C-alpha cells in the first residue's frame, strides 16, 4: 500500500560527528552485507537480525521532523565556520542482490574511503532518518533523553539510529575474503531488538528518485557525555536535511564531518544526493554474504578531556 500521497516524504542523512575528546561507544547497527531473503541467518552469538558473522562496530541512524516541502536558503542556515565540500554521491548498492529495495528496507553502498583524512577511529557516524520536508522543524537533541527513537518517526517526523566508527569504512577491496557484497541495509531490525536506537523498517515503499533541489544545512560540532551504557553525541547545531520530490517518499544520504578541537571545530559539509538505483554491474553475479553489525558492548571509558565542551556532562541524561 505505501504511504498516502499527502504523507510527508522521507529523507535519509548520515552525519559524521568528528570529535576527538571521547571515544564512541560500541552500539547497535548493521553495516555489512545483505543476503538474499531466503538465506538470511543469524550470526553465531550475535544479536537478533544479524546476517552472517558479526563483530562490535559503532553505528547509528537518526531522523528529522515533518512539514511541507519548501526550498530552504543555504545562506540562512550557514554560520561563521569553515566548510569543506567533499564530492560524494550516496546510492542504492549496484550489486545484483535480491531484495535490495523492498517495501520497508533498502541497501546502500558503503561509503568506503569517503571519510579518510576527515575522521579518526574515535569519531562516530550517524545515519539520520527524517521526512525530507523537516528541515525547519528539526531540533538537535541537547540531552540523552531528547534523542528520538524510531517510533517517533510518524509523530515527530524523525529518529536517530545506527552509530558507526569510521574504521568500519576502510579503503581496499570490500569483497576480499568475505564472498559477499558489502552494503548498509536500512530498516532491517523488524523486531527492534537492537535498542535503544533500533534500525526499524521504514513505514512504506519507495520509490527512491533523484531531485536536483537539495537543501544543505550545517551540522555544528557535537558535545559528548558518558553514561554507564554508551557515549552519546549531543548535537549543538542543526544537521543537514535534504528536500526531494517523489511519488511517495524519498531516501537521501547526507554525510557531514564535524571536527572537534580546543575552542571551536571546523565543519565539513559533504555533498548529498538523492538515492538512485544504478545499472547493475555485469561482471558481478548474484551474491549472498556474511553481514557485519554493531553489537552493544561495555561502555568505553572517557579519554583525557582536551576540549572544554566535554567537561561536566557525565551526569546529564544518564539512563537508569
Curated annotation (Swiss-Prot):
<feature type="glycosylation site" description="N-linked (GlcNAc...) asparagine">
    <location>
        <position position="133"/>
    </location>
</feature>
<keyword id="KW-0325">Glycoprotein</keyword>
<feature type="transmembrane region" description="Helical">
    <location>
        <begin position="241"/>
        <end position="266"/>
    </location>
</feature>
<comment type="similarity">
    <text>Belongs to the uroplakin-3 family.</text>
</comment>
<feature type="topological domain" description="Cytoplasmic">
    <location>
        <begin position="267"/>
        <end position="320"/>
    </location>
</feature>
<keyword id="KW-0472">Membrane</keyword>
<dbReference type="GO" id="GO:0016020">
    <property type="term" value="C:membrane"/>
</dbReference>
<protein>
    <recommendedName>
        <fullName>Uroplakin-3b</fullName>
    </recommendedName>
</protein>
<comment type="function">
    <text>Component of the asymmetric unit membrane (AUM); a highly specialized biomembrane elaborated by terminally differentiated urothelial cells. May play an important role in AUM-cytoskeleton interaction in terminally differentiated urothelial cells. It also contributes to the formation of urothelial glycocalyx which may play an important role in preventing bacterial adherence.</text>
</comment>
<dbReference type="InterPro" id="IPR024831">
    <property type="entry name" value="Uroplakin-3"/>
</dbReference>
<feature type="region of interest" description="Disordered">
    <location>
        <begin position="273"/>
        <end position="303"/>
    </location>
</feature>
<feature type="signal peptide">
    <location>
        <begin position="1"/>
        <end position="29"/>
    </location>
</feature>
<dbReference type="GO" id="GO:0010629">
    <property type="term" value="P:negative regulation of gene expression"/>
</dbReference>
<keyword id="KW-1133">Transmembrane helix</keyword>
<dbReference type="GO" id="GO:0005886">
    <property type="term" value="C:plasma membrane"/>
</dbReference>
<keyword id="KW-1003">Cell membrane</keyword>
<feature type="topological domain" description="Lumenal">
    <location>
        <begin position="30"/>
        <end position="240"/>
    </location>
</feature>
<comment type="subunit">
    <text>Heterodimer with uroplakin-1B (UPK1B).</text>
</comment>
<keyword id="KW-0732">Signal</keyword>
<keyword id="KW-0812">Transmembrane</keyword>
